[in-house]
Design a protein with these regions (language model features):
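A structural micro-motif
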Residues: 26, 84-85, 109, 152, ...
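Metal-dependent phosphoester-hydrolase catalytic domains
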Residues: 165, 169, 176-188, 196-278
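Short, well-ordered secondary-structure micro-motifs
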Residues: 41, 77, 84, 165-167, ...
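Active-site beta-strand/loop signature of hydrolases that rely on acidic residues for catalysis
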Residues: 26-33, 52-77, 103, 141, ...
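Solvent-exposed loop/turn segments at secondary-structure junctions
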Residues: 33-36, 70-73, 91-95, 108-109, ...
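Acidic/histidine-rich helix-loop elements
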Residues: 30-50, 119-133, 160, 225-234
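Structured beta-strand-rich core segments of catalytic domains in phosphoester-bond hydrolases
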Residues: 63-155, 255-256
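N-terminal, active-site-proximal structural segment of metallo-dependent hydrolase catalytic domains
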Residues: 2-9, 18-80, 91-98, 172, ...
Length: 278
């Protein structure tokens, strides 16, 4: 085989490998969309919702975890994203209060089982935990890829913004729940707004049991350093939104810069996204 033919063969092999990688990869977004607060003025949900939908459609995640979504927001997203379904309930066990809903592209994934627990000493009951200001929940499901039939557990949560003890104990509870639920050691993702910065002890506790998605990523962070913007146009440095994983390959990790589609932020958090292979 001459040099030209060898080079052509090598390019074909590389292209095929790249195609397989792309075909098997899955995009997952975690997004605190800022609850629909009637006292918000220019940042009112009605002024933001269509831009949020545009961002989601542009990035086309197979799985989408939402924090701070009230029922009217969840319903709106559900109505705009064709082929998507979701799991999750409100903090009251029905439709009131914040959801930690998980949307999924039903053409790509199926849900085998799902549930929600409360971040408290009585996780199976509607309850508020420790020094938390509000009831807090974690919604999870076992998702099956319809092509490969591979399965992955996904947990979505939003820790309390006031209770320091609650945040610490929420980590311990979730790790306990993961051990109880994931008895077959399937790949796993924990995502959400944890209201914790990377140096805080509860984050270190998570890292002792799960992989930090950013540290595991095959490529450097794409986008701003932080995730919380507070609707300010200043540099974003505060990181409180995360992906933690187990038994997964992270191809890329992104803090999506919403200013690329809008002159102002469309939530007080940036959406974060990973591309995974498993």
């Amino acid at each position: 085989m001459n040099l030209f033919n060898k080079s052509c063969l090598l390019l074909i092999i590389i292209s095929l490998n790249l195609s397989v990688t792309i075909a098997q990869s899955t995009k997952i977004i975690s997004y605190n969309i800022r609850y629909a607060n009637n006292t918000d003025k220019e940042n009112n949900w009605n002024n933001r919702k269509d831009k949020i939908i545009s961002l989601l459609k542009n990035n086309n995640p197979a799985i989408l975890g939402i924090q701070e979504g009230l029922i009217q927001q969840i319903d709106y997203i559900d109505s705009c994203l064709s082929n998507y379904k979701y799991i999750g309930i409100g903090r009251d066990g029905k439709n009131k209060g914040e959801f930690s809903a998980i949307f999924y592209d039903s053409l790509k994934y199926n849900v085998i089982e799902s549930n929600t627990f409360w971040l408290s000493n009585t996780p199976n009951k509607i309850s508020k935990g420790w020094d938390a200001a509000l009831n807090r929940i974690c919604t999870y499901g076992l998702f099956e890829n319809l092509k490969s039939h591979k399965k992955v557990w996904i947990f979505n949560t939003h820790f309390d913004h006031i209770g320091k003890i609650a945040r610490k104990n929420s980590v311990q509870l979730i790790l306990t729940k993961i051990n109880e639920i994931n008895t077959t050691n399937f790949p796993l993702i924990l995502m959400g707004d944890l209201n914790l910065t990377p140096e805080e002890a509860p984050i270190q506790l998570l890292k002792s049991s799960l992989d930090d998605g950013l540290e595991l990523s095959n490529t450097p962070l794409i986008g701003p350093k932080g995730t919380f913007n507070g609707f300010s146009l200043d540099e974003i440095s505060k990181k409180i939104d995360y992906f933690f994983t187990k038994n997964l390959t992270i191809l890329s990790y992104t803090h999506i810069n919403d200013l690329e589609i809008s002159k102002s932020h469309i939530s007080d958090h940036l959406p974060i996204m990973i591309e995974i292979k498993f």
